[in-house]
Amino acid sequence: MTMSLDEVREILTEMAEGDDFIQVVPEFFCPEVVGHNDVKLGVMCCLVNQWDTPDGRDRINILLKGQPGCGKTIFIDHLRDRWGALYLSGDAKKSSLKGDGRRSDGGIRLFAKYNGGIVAHDEIEEFSDINTLRDIMENGRYVDAIGGKYEEFEAQIRYVAAANDISKVPKPILSRFDLVYHFDMPSVEDSIRIAQYLIAGVKNLETTDEMIYAYISTAMNIDPVIRPRDIDGLDAKVKPFADHFESINEGKSGRWIKSILRIAKALTRLKLKDEVTAVEIEEAIEMKTASDKQLEIPFD
């Protein structure tokens, strides 16, 4: 399905009965999951920010945490089955992911092969070489030794991970996740809705998937502008930060602010707009603030 930006925007606006379709569209993403629209929006933000820029990282790392059987793996499976993500289990081998310089062919180098792609990693707390993820999550590249020489490989992956026990995940890795979502056991009402879904299934699943894929593909190709046109524009975009810092009576690191800006850029793409405004920055701060409550470590 090939659709123009205007066609996609028109259809989505009709679906949402207004311009604010970003609050409605997540319901159609990963329909196998009942509820969790906040998680769906976060994963969609991850999908639309494919590449970093000369200014730094644009890719958004997502962590899904909670006890087994709460729905985390459904997102992982959806990304693998519908979005072509590289699926990794907790026991993935470093030699397969980054390569093996001792081999003449350098090994598999899955991270390099999935440069620009999606990686869905289940049970990351069981990954023995988890610290090797740090440079990839932050910089989108890594260095490996080949024949006694060091070579740099591009690995700008969109990373979505799931963990049952984050106490086993090193803090430097946890601090690289832009958005963290906790999954509780379903409530009585949620369990009833899940039972309804499992019995009735999803209507028009193939058409819905095609529509969402066309939407995400269109959003990915938008390059939103963050820099303001004048001093008034600068003040307007800084105001959400100033209001937030004053409300909590503390400042935040540059890394935290950069995370807000890349989330805001993703939200702008999902709105099919070409300029980040104070509205998207404020929404990104709300998403990030809720996420920060899931981890007791600073994003710095």
Go through each PLM region and give its residues.
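Trafficking entry modules
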Residues: F299-D300
